[in-house]
Amino acid sequence: MASSIKDVATHAGISIATVSRAVNTPERVSPETLARVQAAMEALQYRPNALGRQLRAVRTGLVGVVLPSLANPVFAECMQGIDEAAASAGQRVMLMTTAYDREREARAIETMLQQRVDGLVLTVADAAANPHLDRLDAERVPYVLVYNDTQGQPRMPVRCSVTVDNRAAARDAIRALLALGHRQVRMLTGTLSASDRAALRHAGYRDALQAAGIVPQPPVEIDFNAEAMAPAELDRLLAPPCPTAVFCSNDRLALLTIRALRARGLRVPEDLSVIGFDGLAMGQWLSPTLATVAQPHRQIGIDAARALARRIAGESVPPITLAHRLLPGGTLAAAPMAPAGSSGATDSTDSTVFFPTSDTQGASR
């Protein structure tokens, strides 16, 4: 079997991106690194795939799109924007989803390359440490990230992306809760390792609480694809010190939270305030309306498709950060004098109160 650029990187003890720079722009690497790459290439008898680059120079008019899920309206709205902009540019679109699974992500990218797409628009689990993006860089395949924030992140090369500032947006959400008197704010999120967006929102949650002198509680993580919150997960969310507000890493999880709280006999926002992240239209159809941080999903898709067209044409395109908006909604209220579940009496020496649990609320099972 012929050696690959990944084999060369492993043999030399460096990244795929560094091997790519040594091959394509040797002036950008140190003489020592260049020597290591050349030695590894000779040892493995590796030759850069000039034929592959020539094939990709022939345009197909096909754009690949890799997204986590269309069940989440966030990505469906983004896809609408991508499709509109691509159609206006005379491009065809090929879509694959990954279900937040890194192996499926790898297979989707490989399939796209086999189909000889001109470029890719994609959302990946982690843009900081991603061998698939390193491979695209190495093979000079144009791509644009959506929702992955690559600016100012440690260990992360700056890559072309279209997103909001997730960390700053989460800080704004928590500051809105703090302004209403909330001091016990819990976070519900999908699996942090499956989404660098959720990880940045968690960082913003921590930033805002710590700036206010409040020790953040550990987040409660559940499956991004969950259709309902398990009783044990709700117990963890409501465990002492009892929260008066819940920040959810996306609107879909916020809607699951509200449904679970109501099934437990708790009122939103009278007993607990809930704020999500995304700005889904369905959240504004509820009564009360969902408080959320809104992202311009369709515009993210449009801007990403346009940026990709520029990259395919050979232009250098910097990351694009769009504005977010805080929608207060009806699920926010001032912090209650005592969290739900208390007897109404307070004791200045012991203000611990308890919510009903799945063990005491049989109907919630």
Describe these PLM feature segments:
Residues 43-49, 103, 124-126, 258:
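Short gly/ser/thr-rich secondary-structure transition/capping motifs
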Residues 43, 84-89, 137-365:
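Bacterial carbohydrate/catabolite-sensing allosteric modules
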Residues 16-21, 56-71, 176, 184-191:
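Short beta-strand segments enriched in small/hydrophobic residues
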